[in-house]
């Protein structure tokens, strides 16, 4: 007998029978005891420690910034692989999302991670953050200009009019 059925069924032996099926005469003593499941105010014993895993309902998406002209908004293209309904081959599917960029730190071509947040506007429900593994253009170090002597061959601009005709 399930718990929901026992709650919906009227008690068999009642001193005050009620003609209604779902009357208000249900006594707390007739309900099953949940003392084993309820949380008590006393701390649990040291032998039993309860750790609940953090449940993240939606995995965060990663994509590439394709437009950053709007203020505090970036347009991100997310590419995912999904099976084709008929041919069962994995096909790339692209979708564009508007994401909130409060500091205008992302430029076109940067990889960002989209985290779900409260709706900021009609189309913006994601927050753009820098992923841990990748570097954005703001945090990427500038490449060092290579010296022209690296090849060992002087450039034409470095040769001083040493031309023979």
UniProtKB/Swiss-Prot annotation:
Disulfide bonds: none annotated. Gene3D superfamilies: Nucleic acid-binding proteins. SUPFAM superfamilies: Nucleic acid-binding proteins (SSF50249). InterPro entries: NA-bd_OB-fold (IPR012340), Ribosomal_uS17 (IPR000266), Ribosomal_uS17_bact/chlr (IPR019984), Ribosomal_uS17_CS (IPR019979). GO terms for molecular function: rRNA binding; structural constituent of ribosome. GO terms for biological process: translation. Belongs to the universal ribosomal protein uS17 family. Component of the chloroplast small ribosomal subunit (SSU). Mature 70S chloroplast ribosomes of higher plants consist of a small (30S) and a large (50S) subunit. The 30S small subunit contains 1 molecule of ribosomal RNA (16S rRNA) and 24 different proteins. The 50S large subunit contains 3 rRNA molecules (23S, 5S and 4.5S rRNA) and 33 different proteins. HAMAP family: Ribosomal_uS17_B. This is Small ribosomal subunit protein uS17c. The lineage of its organism: Eukaryota, Viridiplantae, Streptophyta, Embryophyta, Tracheophyta.
